[in-house]
Amino acid sequence: MPTNERETVVTPGQRFYNEQIAWLRQDSTEELIDRHYHQDAILVSFAKVVQGHAALKEHFRAYLEILEKIEILSLDQFVETKDTIFFEATVRTVKGQVNVYDAFVLRDGKATHHFTGVK
């Protein structure tokens, strides 16, 4: 039976982004790191460099504790290739409204490198 509704195709990069945001909102750092980051993955920001599952889990726990909540106001830019994701979003936390920038280098659907910034 024909319908006027179009199926929305979710790309691997969009799925990764959606899961990343969901786990951050749910404070699910274990699942976030275990499912989205390689064992030796590295996160690079201007404030620090963090490498490995244990350090990443500690980093995200502390990060979420400081922010308390994350509300995505808009996904301003998003681009992906078969092994990269790069996005800009406007978010609100208890610290205020900011623009965040995140780039991921992926291997087998998991991050090997995560570059992040806030403005």
Question: What residue spans do the PLM features occupy?
Answer:
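Short hydrophobic/aromatic-rich beta-strand segments that constitute the beta-sheet cores
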Residues: 43-44, 87, 113-114
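Short beta-strand edge/turn micro-motifs at domain boundaries
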Residues: 99-119
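Short beta-strand segments that buttress and anchor functional surface loops
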Residues: 86-94
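Short, surface-exposed coil-to-beta transition loops
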Residues: 71-73, 96-102
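A solvent-exposed, acidic/Ser-Thr-rich amphipathic alpha-helical stretch
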Residues: 29-81
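Short, solvent-exposed coil/turn segments at beta-strand boundaries
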Residues: 33-36, 81-83, 104-111
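Short acidic-aromatic low-complexity motifs
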Residues: 2-39
